[in-house]
Amino acid sequence: VGVFTDKNLLPDNKNDLEIYESWDEVFENSNAIELLRVQKERLQDKEEINFDEYINSYQLTKDVLNKSQSDLAVLHPMPINIGIEISEDAIEDSKIKYKDQLSHAIPSRIVAFKYVRDEI
């Protein structure tokens, strides 16, 4: 598993993580990535993190996506904070797969619920 984020947001135990220093490194080593939902209120509580610098360094933009391979798949756990973890110009790029994820959300939950109830 690789991680590309501000060093102040990394977990204490990084033993099994590959730490990437740039989007280029991410794209060299990945054909699928999962963005994480950034909670602005949590970042603002961390004095060592400048929110504007975080966005400038880590936001997925159209320019960044243009550097990636054509078959890259970008996933997101939702809800998406457009303008924070992904820019408005990148959200409709075909590499962004949140609409596919949404189409599977309810059926996946139904199956999980039935499984827990031993119905399948």
Segments predicted by a language model, with ranges:
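Structural/interface elements that position substrates and couple domains in central-metabolism enzymes
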Residues: 1-120
